[in-house]
Structures are given as structure tokens and as C-alpha cells.
Amino acid sequence: MADPAECNIKVMCRFRPLNESEVNRGDKYVAKFQGEDTVMIASKPYAFDRVFQSSTSQEQVYNDCAKKIVKDVLEGYNGTIFAYGQTSSGKTHTMEGKLHDPEGMGIIPRIVQDIFNYIYSMDENLEFHIKVSYFEIYLDKIRDLLDVSKTNLSVHEDKNRVPYVKGCTERFVCSPDEVMDTIDEGKSNRHVAVTNMNEHSSRSHSIFLINVKQENTQTEQKLSGKLYLVDLAGSEKVSKTGAEGAVLDEAKNINKSLSALGNVISALAEGSTYVPYRDSKMTRILQDSLGGNCRTTIVICCSPSSYNESETKSTLLFGQRAKTIKNTVCVNVELTAEQWKKKYEKEKEKNKTLRNTIQWLENELNRWRNGETVPIDEQFDKEKANLEAFTADKDVAITNDKPAAAIGMAGSFTDAERRKCEEEIAKLYKQLDDKDEEINQQSQLVEKLKTQMLDQEELLASTRRDQDNMQAELNRLQAENDASKEEVKEVLQALEELAVNYDQKSQEVEDKTKEYELLSDELNQKSATLASIDAELQKLKEMTNHQKKRAAEMMASLLKDLAEIGIAVGNNDVKQPEGTGMIDEEFTVARLYISKMKSEVKTMVKRCKQLESTQTESNKKMEENEKELAACQLRISQHEAKIKSLTEYLQNVEQKKRQLEESVDSLGEELVQLRAQEKVHEMEKEHLNKVQTANEVKQAVEQQIQSHRETHQKQISSLRDEVEAKEKLITDLQDQNQKMVLEQERLRVEHERLKAVDQEKSRKLHELTVMQDRREQARQDLKGLEETVAKELQTLHNLRKLFVQDLATRVKKSAEVDSDDTGGSAAQKQKISFLENNLEQLTKVHKQLVRDNADLRCELPKLEKRLRATAERVKALESALKEAKENASRDRKRYQQEVDRIKEAVRSKNMARRGHSAQIAKPIRPGQHPAASPTHPGAVRGGGSFVQNNQPVGLRGGGGKQA
């Protein structure tokens, strides 16, 4: 870089006119202007480099703010222009304006036009490369406006510690129209919103970067300059803008970043040792523009309305602080090898002089330390030391020049050697052009392969997302199944509690029966009338014995069922109970348990059969796939061998063809010579006296022979070139075939992986089916349980009726008993009420079981529906996999056709050389999308073929606007 120089940041102030809402509100125009550099607000003056009134045109603003910076950027300096102010103060109007209106366009479109106009007027030996970037800072994230997929770019530093946005799209341009098309494309992607103060409020800070690199083709001097054109979002008061929701979040981030910018300006103005550039991504990007190597111009946009007076004062104070900041600017020069060498020699001489000075001073110091007195003429004199160093260098240079001159004289080239060197150079240039074309083709091929790889990655990601959704659905169904199991367990537990309570109540009934027997004995002793009651009691005992016998029979049937289950399961440990005093409720529980065991055993047997059939089918599929894979591998090896043999055969045929052509040529020449000799002999016989005419005929024949020879030589050379081209094409096809084989191998691996995933999902589907079968079996068990409980309740109800009738008859018979009998009737009533309470509790439990059963029946259709949806999803995934394979096959065919078409197009294009006028160099740049304006095609330097407009551009000055 050149020597640095300091310069202040230029601050321009612009006031917009009152808008319609301010006029309707009756706001006052508070700004008063004094000259062209001062404005008065509330009787306080604010001075800037330039103050623009409301009537100032866009052209005047541009001429005073930005016109000079074009020359600076093209001379190798960095430049920045950004607009600052509150919302709706005219920042976007100042920077952009109406992009395609000659009078209403702002700074950005005008500066673009001026850059190219200035280039066209410069020396034709200069070559320019111009590239542009367009990005925004939205919610403190850097978002590329030319590629909306890049939403969170990062800020890095280059080798000179200059911040830059990594990964941002760079478009190479060669005309103002292409730049404007790029701006239109980026502006359409920028975030805007409607607020109470502005219908088109910018919700982000936009930065348009123009990077200009120039090279002098004669001196090889290289300069580079960057121009940042920044449109900041305005600071907002929520009470005025009415922002809410997402707009409110945007306003918070805007105010935060502007506050960070204000802190940086304040720190630079106060000369602080620490400047908080890293508090915001915007200040990080503009670090070089604020106190660094850059010529910076700030346009502060203000509202003249009294409604916004406080915001206007804050903006003016910001501008005054920024005006005190000094930047250190220097030219961005890339030194050539010769310049680096000169600089090295200069530093070397300087270092040598300093060493001589140090040596002289050390000698003089040692003499003084040793006690000597150094005379004045021997003391150090700077001029004398420089003169001695210059004389010594001159002698060395004279000594070195003599052998160099002798070598130069001996090394002069002859004309033949010079021509030979020029021919070699031409051949090398041609090889470079061929390599450029090959590089272009390979770059396009790599780009297409990248696109295909991204498509495959997206397809893989979607498949993985579907798999995750399926897994989540399976987990949810598993959780619901577990919950249903818990509910069934709770129901069974409730039934067990009921059985225990029933046992307790039965024990209490037995105790009360004993008490009743005692009372009956007392009644028998007191009254003979109770003998009939004893007889009836005997009948009741007989009935009880009958019930016990029936219970014993039921127990025997249950034991038979247990024995059958033990034989089916393989467990023969079922033992006969010793006692026979079990009641009906215990038998009911045992019967339910036995029926459940039977159903589970049947389910297990059925599932085992299904698993065996599934395993058999899976083994068959695996064998078929292995056979198909072996056949494919065999077919691939056969094709490779066939291609190799065909290649060798083609080479042999070409060699034979060349030999035959050479023999045909030689025979043709001999035939022509024989015909010529025959013709000469005939003419000699007919015209013996015309010797002169015969000589002329002989010359004509020789000329004809020579022309035939030249024609055959040209044909031979063209055929050889064609053979070489065919061999190259065969080599390319072999490479392509190898790539297709690798691609096929990759697809085979992918197919195996997807097949494994499919098997896993089939297994999970089978598990769900088994779970559904279990749920159905549980429903059947609950149904049987419900029927059993209903039967038991009916039995209890019948017993209750019998017991009530018995008590009624006994009460009638004992109506004439004395007052001592009242205690017995009260005990009977208490027993009746106790049994009635038990009956009510059993009825409630029955109703609860019925409700639970109904809920389970309602839940069952939902689970069946989910199971069907899961099966349909699996089918959809299988069809998607099949479609993806078909698409991959079509893509491979289309890719092969495109490669063939590109080869044919490259082969058919002619080479063209650069002219003397201005030309646009567009070497191929991988990774760029086509630019928006295809109206300016350019020629490839060193290749001569035309390419698209999405490639780096080199622009030469002095020769016109386009090639």
C-alpha cells in the first residue's frame, strides 16, 4: 500500500419536506438554514460539511456527496456512503430513490453510471474487474439478498485484518444495466413493512458493495478499491410507529444496532482506546469505514416537523460527533515482482548504510572508552559516511556491469532462434486455450454434479423426516397401548378389591348367622312356637348344602380347565385345593383368570405362526435380492471387458486404416506418373517436331502430380486429426462409464440401506398388528367378564328375594312373640340393610365396568384408524422410494445427453482473438448463478468462445462501452 494520509469523515445533512400526515396535523417547519453548511434548530446552530434544504434535487445531493468518491475508488481508495436518521426521514430515497427514473434516482444508481463512464474515459491499457454484492442485516443476522437461501452469514477477517462477509454472493458485472438488474433483484428480497410513520419502512440495514480491481497491462500495476453503499434502517419510537408483534421485534433489533453504531461513533470522537466494533454485526462490517482505511461520507437525514424535533436533534448531534472522526486512508496497491525487488534493494541499501553507521560509531565509542581522544576529522560525520558508502557501491556496480555486458552480448538471439521461440510460445498459448476450455467443461460438470447431490440430499432428508414422524407415531401408539393396559390393570385391581370386600362381608354374615343361631336357641327355650322357625331354618341349611355342592361341582370344572391349560402351556403344577369352602365370587374370579389364560395362549400360538411365515418371506426376498445383485455385478464386468476389447479393436482398425490410406496414396501417385508417362510417349510419337509443346505438357503434368500430392497430404492430416479426436472421445466415454459404475454402486448401497429401513418398518408394523390383536382379545375378555358379573349379580338378586321372602314369613310367624323377641327382629333388619348396601355397591361397580367397557369400545376405532394411516404411510414411502430411483435413472440419462451436447457445442465453436478496442473478459467462475441481464455477452480471454453472463468480468478502459 501507499503512504497513509489522514482525512475527516464528511457529514452531509439533508432535510425532507413535510409529508401529508404532518401537514394535516398542522406541524411546524422547525429548521432554519444559515448558508450552505449550518442549520438552526430551536435557536441552536449545527454546522456540517454541507446542508441540503428540502427543495434540493437528487442530482445536487449526488454531486456534493458522492461524485468525488468515484474517482477515489478508481484510484485505489476505499469509500463508504451511508444514510443515517430516524424512520421516514428519507434515507432510502437518498440512497436509492426511483431506480429507473433519470431525475428521481438516488446515489446508488447515479454512482454506478459514473463508475462506468469514468472507466470508459481512462487509458485503454487499464483492465478492470468489477464485482458487486448485496446483503442486509435483519434481526442481527446477515442475509444475502442475491441468494435468499443464505440467511445467517458470518463476518471474518482477511490477511490484512479487514472484515468481510464470508460466503456472500458476488456477481461480476460489465455494464450499468447489469448492476441495476442486480439491485432490482436484491431489492425485491429486502424486508419492508407498513408503520404509522411510513408506508414502506425498511426493516433491515442494506449494504451494496462494489469491488473494483484494475491492472495496467503495460506496467502490471494493480489497484483495488471497495465502495460500500449503506442504507440504514431508521430508529423508531414505538409510541409513534405503533409497532407490534414481529414489527416490534424488528424495531428492537434496529434500535439496538443503531445504538451500537452510536457507541462506536462516540468512542472514536472521544479518542477512546477501546472501540466496541463487535457489539453489532453492522459496526463489525463497517469497521474499516469508521476510523480505518476508507473515505467515508455520512448523509444524516432529518425531519423538519416539530412532531419529530427531539429525534432530529439527536440525529444532528450524531452527525457532529461523527464529523470529528479521522480516517487513515491509503491506496490499495498490489506490487509487482519488479517493484518488490526495487523495494527490497532500497531497504537493503538503507540497512547497509545503517550498519556502516553503527560500525563507525562503535569504533569511535571503543576509542573513547579506551581513553583515546578522537580528532574532529575522524569523528562521525553523516555526510562523509554517506559519501563513502555511495563510492563503494559505485565501484561494486562497475565491477558487476562488465561481466553482465559480456553475457548480454553472448546471449543475443538469432532470427531463426527468435522465430522458433515465437512458434513455441504460440503452441503454448494454444495449449493454454485448450486447457481453459477443458477447465470450463469440468467446472460446468462439477456444478451439475453438485446440484444433483443437493437434490439427493434433500430427498434423503425428507425420507429421514418421514421416518422420524413414523417413529413418533409408533411411540405415541405404544404409549396409548400402555395407558390402556394400565386401565385394564386398574379394573382388575378393583375387581380384586371387590372380591376381598365380599369375603369380609361373607365372614361378617357368618358371624351374624352364628349370633342368630344363639338367639334362635334362646327363643326355642323360651317359646315352643319357635319350633316351626327351627324347621324352616333346617330347610335353609339344606339349601345351603345344596349351594355348597354346586360350588364343589364348579370347582371341579375349573380344575379341569386348569389342567387343560397346564397341558397346553407345558406346566403340570396345578394342584387340588384342600378345602371346599370357597364362595361363588372366588369361583368367578378363577373362571375369569382361566379364560384370560386361554386367550393369551391362543394369541401366542397365532403370533408364532405369523412370525414363521414372515421369516420365510423375508428369507425369500433376501435370496432374490442377492441373485439380482450378483447378476448386476456380472453384467457390469461383462460390459467393462466388452468396452476394453472394443477400444483395442478400434485402435487396431485405425492403424490398419492409416496404413491402407498411405498405400492408396502411394499407388495413386504411381498411377498418375504412369499415365503422365504414357501421355508423354503418345505425344512424342504424334508430334516429334514439337519439342517445346511436349515440355509444356510435362510441366503441366508435374504440376498436376504436385497438386494431387498436396491434396492427399491434407486429407491424411485431417483424417489423423479426426482419429485423434475419436480416441479422445473414447477416453472420455471410458471415464464417463467408470463414473456411472461408481454411481451405480452408490445407488446399490443406498438401495440396500432403504431395503433395511423398509424391513425395520415392516417389523414395527407387524408389532403394531400383534398389539391390536392383543387389544381385541382384551376386549373379548372384558365382554366375558361383564357377562359373568351380570350373572353373579342376578344370582345375588335372586338370593336377596329369597332372603326377603324368608324374613317376611318369619316376621309374620313371630308377630305374637313377647317383648324379648324384639331384639331378634332388629338384628334381622340390620342384616337386611347390610345386604342391601352390599347390593347397591355391587350395582355401582357393575355400572362403572359397563362405562369403562364403552370407553374402550369408543377408543378402539381411533386406534384402528391410526393403524391404517400408518400402513398407508409405509406404502407411500415405498412408492416415493421407487419414484426416487426412477428420477435418478432419468437424471443420469439427461446428464449423459447434456455432456454430449456440451462436447459437441465446444467442438463446433471457432476461436477468436481479442481486438484493439475495449473488451470484456469473462473466465468461467464455478458456483455463480446466471445474472439478471443477459444483454451484454462477452468473449473469453484466451479461449475465443462465448460464455454466459454469470462469470467474472474484466473491463478495459479507453475503447468503448462494450466489445
From Swiss-Prot:
<dbReference type="GO" id="GO:0099609">
    <property type="term" value="F:microtubule lateral binding"/>
</dbReference>
<dbReference type="GO" id="GO:0008017">
    <property type="term" value="F:microtubule binding"/>
</dbReference>
<keyword id="KW-0493">Microtubule</keyword>
<dbReference type="GO" id="GO:0099524">
    <property type="term" value="C:postsynaptic cytosol"/>
</dbReference>
<dbReference type="GO" id="GO:0098987">
    <property type="term" value="P:regulation of modification of synapse structure, modulating synaptic transmission"/>
</dbReference>
<keyword id="KW-0597">Phosphoprotein</keyword>
<dbReference type="GO" id="GO:0072383">
    <property type="term" value="P:plus-end-directed vesicle transport along microtubule"/>
</dbReference>
<dbReference type="GO" id="GO:0005871">
    <property type="term" value="C:kinesin complex"/>
</dbReference>
<dbReference type="GO" id="GO:0051642">
    <property type="term" value="P:centrosome localization"/>
</dbReference>
<dbReference type="GO" id="GO:0090316">
    <property type="term" value="P:positive regulation of intracellular protein transport"/>
</dbReference>
<dbReference type="GO" id="GO:0098971">
    <property type="term" value="P:anterograde dendritic transport of neurotransmitter receptor complex"/>
</dbReference>
<dbReference type="GO" id="GO:0042802">
    <property type="term" value="F:identical protein binding"/>
</dbReference>
<dbReference type="InterPro" id="IPR027640">
    <property type="entry name" value="Kinesin-like_fam"/>
</dbReference>
<dbReference type="GO" id="GO:0047497">
    <property type="term" value="P:mitochondrion transport along microtubule"/>
</dbReference>
<keyword id="KW-0547">Nucleotide-binding</keyword>
<dbReference type="GO" id="GO:0042267">
    <property type="term" value="P:natural killer cell mediated cytotoxicity"/>
</dbReference>
<dbReference type="GO" id="GO:0032839">
    <property type="term" value="C:dendrite cytoplasm"/>
</dbReference>
<dbReference type="GO" id="GO:0043005">
    <property type="term" value="C:neuron projection"/>
</dbReference>
<dbReference type="GO" id="GO:0042391">
    <property type="term" value="P:regulation of membrane potential"/>
</dbReference>
<feature type="modified residue" description="Phosphoserine">
    <location>
        <position position="933"/>
    </location>
</feature>
<feature type="region of interest" description="Disordered">
    <location>
        <begin position="908"/>
        <end position="963"/>
    </location>
</feature>
<dbReference type="GO" id="GO:0160040">
    <property type="term" value="P:mitocytosis"/>
</dbReference>
<dbReference type="GO" id="GO:0008574">
    <property type="term" value="F:plus-end-directed microtubule motor activity"/>
</dbReference>
<comment type="subunit">
    <text>Oligomer composed of two heavy chains and two light chains. Interacts with GRIP1 and PPP1R42. Interacts with SYBU. Interacts with JAKMIP1. Interacts with PLEKHM2. Interacts with ECPAS. Interacts with ZFYVE27. Found in a complex with OGT, RHOT1, RHOT2 and TRAK1. Interacts with APP (via cytoplasmic domain).</text>
</comment>
<keyword id="KW-0206">Cytoskeleton</keyword>
<dbReference type="GO" id="GO:1990049">
    <property type="term" value="P:retrograde neuronal dense core vesicle transport"/>
</dbReference>
<feature type="modified residue" description="Omega-N-methylarginine">
    <location>
        <position position="956"/>
    </location>
</feature>
<dbReference type="InterPro" id="IPR027417">
    <property type="entry name" value="P-loop_NTPase"/>
</dbReference>
<keyword id="KW-0458">Lysosome</keyword>
<dbReference type="Pfam" id="PF00225">
    <property type="entry name" value="Kinesin"/>
</dbReference>
<comment type="similarity">
    <text>Belongs to the TRAFAC class myosin-kinesin ATPase superfamily. Kinesin family. Kinesin subfamily.</text>
</comment>
<dbReference type="GO" id="GO:0005739">
    <property type="term" value="C:mitochondrion"/>
</dbReference>
<dbReference type="GO" id="GO:0035774">
    <property type="term" value="P:positive regulation of insulin secretion involved in cellular response to glucose stimulus"/>
</dbReference>
<dbReference type="GO" id="GO:0048489">
    <property type="term" value="P:synaptic vesicle transport"/>
</dbReference>
<dbReference type="GO" id="GO:0044877">
    <property type="term" value="F:protein-containing complex binding"/>
</dbReference>
<feature type="domain" description="Kinesin motor">
    <location>
        <begin position="8"/>
        <end position="325"/>
    </location>
</feature>
<dbReference type="GO" id="GO:1904115">
    <property type="term" value="C:axon cytoplasm"/>
</dbReference>
<dbReference type="GO" id="GO:0044295">
    <property type="term" value="C:axonal growth cone"/>
</dbReference>
<dbReference type="GO" id="GO:1903078">
    <property type="term" value="P:positive regulation of protein localization to plasma membrane"/>
</dbReference>
<dbReference type="InterPro" id="IPR036961">
    <property type="entry name" value="Kinesin_motor_dom_sf"/>
</dbReference>
<dbReference type="GO" id="GO:0032418">
    <property type="term" value="P:lysosome localization"/>
</dbReference>
<dbReference type="GO" id="GO:0005524">
    <property type="term" value="F:ATP binding"/>
</dbReference>
